[in-house]
C-alpha cells in the first residue's frame, strides 16, 4: 500500500509542475470538469473556527499533491479559494446569524459549524437547501441535516471522525496473563460485548501488596465518554426524532436506561476512583490501568494521553444487548450555504465545495489515511478498529439542540451517579423536554426561561413559608 501511495504522489507532483491547460494533462484522479462553472475571478471563503488560510512552508508529499489539486481548481473555475477562520468554535452560529439577518451576500461563503450547534441553524433557516453531490458526503451527516425531506448541510467528506473507543494497555493485560490479541479476536467475531469486557476487567484488578487497596485498576477515562458510549453502544439515545422532525425525550427508554444502569455499575466496580473529570490524564501514564474509554484522538493523534504508555491497542466500544453492531457517538462538523444567495449562486457554491473536499491522493489510494497511524499502534487497531469506525458511527439526536456540554451533560450525564438511573432520568425530564420544545417550535426560549423563573420563585416561596411555619411551632416540652 505504501509503495503504491508513493507512486501516486510522485506522479501527481510531477503533473503539478505542469500547466493543466490541455485536457490531456489533467491527472486521471481529478474529477470531471463541470462545464459552465465559472466564478469570474471571485474569492470563495470556506469559513470555520480553526483554519489559518496559510499553506505549509515545507509541505509533505501528500500536502503538496493536495495544494496542486486546489491550484487546478482555482485555474479551472476562475476562483480563489480561501479556507480561514471566521469566529470561535462556539460563536460560528452567531456569525452565521449575523450574515443572514443582514442579508449580507457581499462575499461568497460556505460556513462550517460544529455538529452540536446545528439545531439553531436548522430551526432558524440559516442554511439554504443543499441539493448537489450528496452522495459525496457522509450519509449519516446528510440524514442528520435533512428535515422535511430537504438537506441543509454536509460535512467534510464521506467518513466519520471516530469518537468513543476502548484503549488498552498491553503490558497490564500481559501481566495479568491475558493475551491482548484475544480482544481483537472477540471484536472480529462479534463477541466483544459488555459482559466480555467485564470478564477482562475482573481479571486485571489486583492488590499487589496485600494492603487492601487496589494497585492495578480496570478502567479509567472521561466518565462522560463512558456514559454516552454505553448508551450509543446499546442502540439508545436521549431523544427520539419523529417522522415530522420533532424531538421527544427518550432517556427513559429500555435501551438507554439499561446503559445508564450499567455505567453506574462500572463506576462502582471498575473505574479507578477519581475526584476531577480529567484525573484519567494522570492515571493512565502511571501504567496501572488496563482500559481507557476515550475518544480516538486521544491515541491516534499521536500526542495525547494514550501515547504516554509504550504499547497500546484499541477496539470499538463493546456491544450492549440491544445492539447488532459496533458504533460510536459521532460529531461531524457541518458546512452549509448561508441563506442569502439566489439559487444559481448557492448551487455554484455547493459545486465548488464538493470539488474542494475531494482529495485525489486519498481517492487514488483508499488506504492512504492510515499511513501515519501505523507508527502509533498495532495494525489491528488501525485496520480493524479505526477503519471500521470511520465508516460506522451514530449522530445522536441531542446534537440538534447543542453539544453534550450544554444539553445532556449538565442536565443528566454529569450527575448520573447521584441516585438510581431512573430517578436521575426523571429529574432531568423537565429541562430536557423544555430544550426539545424550543427546537420543535412549541415554545420560545423566552417562554421557557419565564416558566423556569416562576417555578423557582414558587419553590422559594414555599420553602420560606415552611421555614416560618416551623419557627412558629411551639418547642417540644
Briefly describe each language-model feature range.
Residues 6, 18-117, 344, 363-367, ...:
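Conserved N-terminal structural module of periplasmic/extracytoplasmic solute-binding proteins
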Residues 9, 13-17:
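Hydrophobic core
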Residues 25-44, 87-93, 113-164, 195:
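Hinge/lid segment of periplasmic solute-binding proteins
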Residues 45-48, 108-111, 147-159, 164-166, ...:
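Extracytoplasmic/periplasmic solute-binding protein
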Residues 132-137, 187-189, 237-258, 320-327:
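Short, solvent-exposed loop/beta-turn-alpha elements that line the ligand-binding surface or hinge
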Residues 198-202, 238-276:
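Glycine-centered hinge/linker elements that transmit conformational signals in sensory
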Residues 304-371:
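Extracytoplasmic/periplasmic substrate-recognition and gating elements
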Residues 329, 351-419, 450-459:
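Long, aromatic- and glycine/proline-rich binding clefts that accommodate carbohydrate-like moieties
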